[in-house]
């Protein structure tokens, strides 16, 4: 009888341990790929150097404003054409990591083991992003000088209301007399921002462009190339940087990563890891 009870006990213990093991496997979060971005996210979230770089970028842009206003031949847009000297003035900014700081979303992705686009829409709908350091004073300065502020973003149109709410909640300039928030998927617009910049250029002289990706300044076609060619693009437009174009540092994501994979993201983590390692130059 004692042996039988011991047998039942052993069986019950085995079932319990198996169940515990299965549950553990189910709830274990695979963060292996997300953790590769951890240092870049921590840099953006906790380093003084990142904050200083953002403030430096926007302070530099503010110092150029009066010169840009005075020079009627001044334009920052490659899409600008014809006689624009008498047009009203505008500045175009990207939104994410340029105006709105989404580093908390990136932190969530690491902790949850999920990767973009999982959770992105939900984050956007919260409308709780904080401003990128330096942007508030820059935009206040520009707005006070009579410059129209346009936000050109590749957030999907579903997030338009929440994005507007977020920007207004931060007290940033946001005019309601015309559409100043130009979303992807709105009016048939795709990811390339050329057509949206051209739309603004019809009525405004564009003084500056501000963003964190090459495509905030040039066409998607020109920017979607290999690593070496992208580096040459920085040199090609060397007379624009820090004068008419202002780039924010974003080590967390962007087309720069796509260039590592030949602009075609691999299907497996193993292949992605290999391509990342192959891109390193010791």
Where does each model-flagged region fall?
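Bacterial Sec-dependent N-terminal signal peptides
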Residues: 1-28
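Non-catalytic pre-domain segments flanking phosphatase-related domains
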Residues: 24-93, 260-282
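C-terminal cap/substrate-recognition subdomain and adjoining C-terminal extension
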Residues: 28-31, 59, 160-282
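Second-shell loop/turn segments in exported
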Residues: 43-52, 121-128, 150-156, 186
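Surface-exposed patches in mature extracellular/periplasmic domains of secreted proteins
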Residues: 69-81, 149-154, 176-179
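Active-site neighborhood of HAD-like aspartate-dependent phosphohydrolases
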Residues: 88, 99-130, 144
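Structural recognition of the beta-strand scaffold that forms the well-ordered cores
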Residues: 90-94, 100-102, 148-153, 180-182, ...
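Substrate-recognition element of Asp-dependent hydrolases with the DxDx(T/V) motif
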Residues: 97, 135-168, 214
């Amino acid at each position: 009888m004692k042996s039988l009870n011991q047998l039942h006990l052993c069986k019950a213990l085995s079932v319990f341990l198996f169940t515990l093991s299965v549950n553990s496997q189910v709830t274990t979060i695979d963060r292996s790929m997300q953790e590769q971005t951890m240092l870049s996210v921590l840099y953006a979230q906790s380093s003084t150097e990142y904050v200083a770089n953002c403030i430096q970028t926007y302070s530099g842009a503010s110092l150029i404003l009066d010169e840009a206003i005075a020079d009627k031949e001044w334009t920052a847009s490659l899409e600008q054409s014809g006689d624009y000297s008498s047009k009203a003035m505008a500045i175009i900014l990207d939104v994410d990591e340029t105006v709105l700081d989404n580093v908390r979303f990136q932190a969530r992705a690491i902790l949850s083991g999920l990767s973009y686009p999982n959770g992105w829409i939900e984050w956007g709908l919260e409308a709780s992003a904080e401003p990128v350091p330096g942007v508030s004073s820059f935009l206040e300065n520009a707005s006070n000088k009579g410059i129209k502020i346009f936000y050109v973003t590749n957030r999907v149109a579903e997030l338009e209301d929440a994005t507007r709410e977020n920007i207004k909640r931060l007290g940033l300039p946001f005019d309601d007399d015309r559409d100043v928030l130009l979303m992807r998927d709105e009016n048939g617009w795709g990811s390339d921002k050329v057509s949206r910049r051209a739309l603004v250029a019809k009525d405004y002289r564009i003084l500056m462009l501000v963003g964190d990706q090459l495509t905030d300044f040039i066409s998607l076609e020109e920017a979607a190339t290999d690593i070496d060619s992208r580096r040459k693009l920085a040199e090609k437009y060397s007379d624009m940087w820090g004068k008419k174009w202002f780039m924010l540092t974003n080590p967390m994501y962007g087309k720069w990563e796509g260039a590592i994979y030949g602009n075609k993201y691999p299907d497996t983590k193993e292949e992605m890891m290999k391509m990342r390692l192959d891109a390193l130059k010791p």
